[in-house]
Structure formats: structure tokens, C-alpha cells
Design a protein with these regions (language model features):
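Short, aromatic- and glycine-rich surface loops/edge beta-strands on solvent-exposed regions
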Residues: 104-107, 111-125
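N-terminal prosegments of processed precursors
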Residues: 10-104
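Edge beta-strands of extracellular beta-sandwich domains
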Residues: 79, 124-141
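Fold-level signature of zinc-dependent metallopeptidase catalytic domains
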Residues: 141-191
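Short alpha-helical segments and helix-capping/turn motifs at coil-helix boundaries
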Residues: 48-53, 101-104, 113-115, 152-156, ...
Length: 191
């Protein structure tokens, strides 16, 4: 029953978002006992490749969650669970004696109006999400990086429709030299 009510409360994409992305680069810092989060950079990107339906994640999966609220109405308009390597590192012996800071990125649909974002982390003791960061973001802010993106060569291997309703796989040519690009594409096609 809870799932059906959540589905009924889904957000209208066109009301709140454009088809661009807002990439949020943030640091997770801490050790075995504590963690904190801080935004490092905001970046406007030209495409939103995520869902335009089911913007509110009903499942609660992941060690972290991002929640996006419409500032004017305080309505939850986007949420997604995610995991990080920092979360894994916090469970190591090294984290008992050291504090580290790891950079992470998450993309949300680009808001049309000011929003409030929250990043929460699941506490292993009670399995509940607890607030790490809460910040207002104005999509018109001069502090959002809108610089030209680097031109990269992209080869589509298979295309089955708009990415908002599909799962995208990206193959990076790491380990291949510039002269081996044809081999890389052939290897990716074989996959």
C-alpha cells in the first residue's frame, strides 16, 4: 500500500525541471566513527539522461540519499539512493586510525526554481537516514559552472531509445593508447 501511495505522489518533471543536469560535486569526509559532507562545486551539464517519471525513489536502497525539495512549497520533487567507495572505506581498519576526504558526484535534473538539497547517510546502528548536508541551490546562481565542456569523441555502439527510459552503459578507453582507438571500439562492440 505504501508503494502505491508513493507512486501517486510522483512529481511532474516539466513543472520543476529542465532537460539539463545539475552535477553536484561534494566531499565526504570522516573515519570509522563519523562523517560529514560539503559541496565543492556545482556544474550545469547539457543533458539529463535520467528518468523523467518516477522521480521520487520509493525503495530506500543505498547507503546515501539525495533529496531535492522545491524551496517555495517544500515539496519533495526528486530523490535517489546511492552508494560510494567512501562508505566501503569507512568499514576498513585504516578508517579506525585515519580521517580522509573523498570527492563524489551526483547528478540531478536541472531545477527551474530554487531548491533545497539534502544528502543523508544511513546509520548502520539503526538503519535510518541521518542528515549530512542541507543547502539551498538557486539554478540562476553565478557560482554554478557553465563553462564549455571538453569535446570528447563518442562512438554509439548500440542505441535502443531515449536514455530517460533505458540503462546507459559507458565504456572508457582507459588502458588503450590513442593509436588503439579502433581496437577499443571493436572490443567494446564484442562486449
Amino acid at each position: 500500500i505504501l508503494y502505491s501511495f508513493t507512486c501517486l505522489a510522483q512529481t511532474n518533471f516539466e513543472k520543476h525541471f529542465t532537460k539539463k543536469s545539475l552535477r553536484i560535486d561534494f566531499a565526504l569526509s570522516g573515519n570509522w566513527d563519523f562523517q560529514a559532507a560539503a559541496i565543492q562545486q556545482l556544474r550545469e551539464e547539457p543533458v539529463w539522461a535520467g528518468p523523467v517519471k518516477n522521480l521520487i525513489d520509493p525503495f530506500g536502497y543505498g547507503g546515501y540519499y539525495i533529496n531535492v525539495y522545491d524551496k517555495a512549497g517544500k515539496e519533495l520533487i526528486y530523490s535517489r539512493g546511492f552508494n560510494t567507495l567512501f562508505e566501503e572505506w569507512r568499514s576498513t581498519e585504516q578508517a579506525k586510525t585515519e580521517t580522509q576526504s573523498w570527492t563524489n558526484s551526483i547528478s540531478i535534473p536541472y531545477p527551474k526554481a530554487p531548491v533545497i538539497i539534502e544528502i543523508t547517510a544511513r546509520d548502520k546502528a539503526d538503519m535510518q537516514f541521518h542528515l549530512l548536508l542541507k543547502q539551498e541551490i538557486d539554478p540562476a546562481s553565478i557560482f554554478i559552472d557553465r563553462g564549455k565542456l571538453k569535446e570528447n569523441r563518442i562512438t554509439k555502439i548500440q542505441y535502443n531509445g531515449d536514455s530517460s527510459g533505458k540503462v546507459d552503459l559507458v565504456f572508457l578507453a582507459e588502458g588503450y593508447t590513442a593509436d588503439e582507438q579502433e581496437k577499443f571500439v571493436a572490443d567494446a562492440k564484442r562486449f
